[in-house]
Amino acid sequence: MIELSRVAKSFGKNHVLRGVNLTIPRGQSMVVIGGSGTGKSVLLKSILGLVTPDSGRITLEGADVREANRDAFLARFGMLFQGGALFDSLKVWENVAFRLMRGATKLPKDEARAIAIEKLRRVGLKPETADMFPGELSGGMQKRVGLARAIAAEPEIIFFDEPTTGLDPIMSGVLNALIREIVIEMGATAMTITHDMSSVRAIADRVAMLHDGLIRWTGLVSDMDQADDPYLQQFIHGRADGPIESVR
């Protein structure tokens, strides 16, 4: 379980997070939504330890993440980055196995390659893809490679940063279904940040809306459409009028 208690972060006079409280239950898929510039990325980076909050506490299974051994802490995570973040100079299998051959794991090359090919198969890519380079793949295939890398080390927790960015609606649907399937299969805890409502409905067990540096609403995805928060309803239905627009 990941818990955030009154987490705040400012950059100069820009108060990005204003005291965020959020619980991500073990084995659940939490999707954090909100408009551009609402602090979703800062929230994610705070959990990962890439940004240090000004105040508040973030715990993983009750332990403060700031006091954890960093290598052991990060070894529990997998992540699918928004832009893929693949290394163009490495073959596909080397991208997938990157963590496996480094850090505390340091698997032999042959073993790491075998795991990489297995994970590529799991995300629907043929074994021959392993010896290609990222630049030879379509955007959708690159996203699948990124997903294979995220799950290669069998992480307990997987983060997804705008997973469908740059994909057409059909490929977005395929990737969303694949993410949901894999998270359930692995029994992983997942956190996704996105503004793509198709991802929300396909991936989430629970949803949290971040607005003006605070969690305005959180609950089951099945309760989202009936929630009485006007900001949430404006966002999920894509309306340009109403409370969100009026405060800008």
Predicted regions and their residues:
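Catalytic Walker B motif of ABC-type/P-loop ATPase nucleotide-binding domains
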Residues: I158-D161
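ABC ATPase NBD coupling module
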Residues: V65-G78, K109, M224-A227
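Conserved ABC ATPase "signature" region
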Residues: K109-E128
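Short coil-to-helix segment of the ABC ATPase nucleotide-binding domain corresponding to the Q-loop/switch region
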Residues: L90-F98
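Conserved ABC ATPase signature
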Residues: F133-L137, M141
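Conserved catalytic motifs of ABC-family nucleotide-binding domains
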Residues: E154
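Helix-to-loop junction immediately C-terminal to a conserved catalytic motif
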Residues: L48
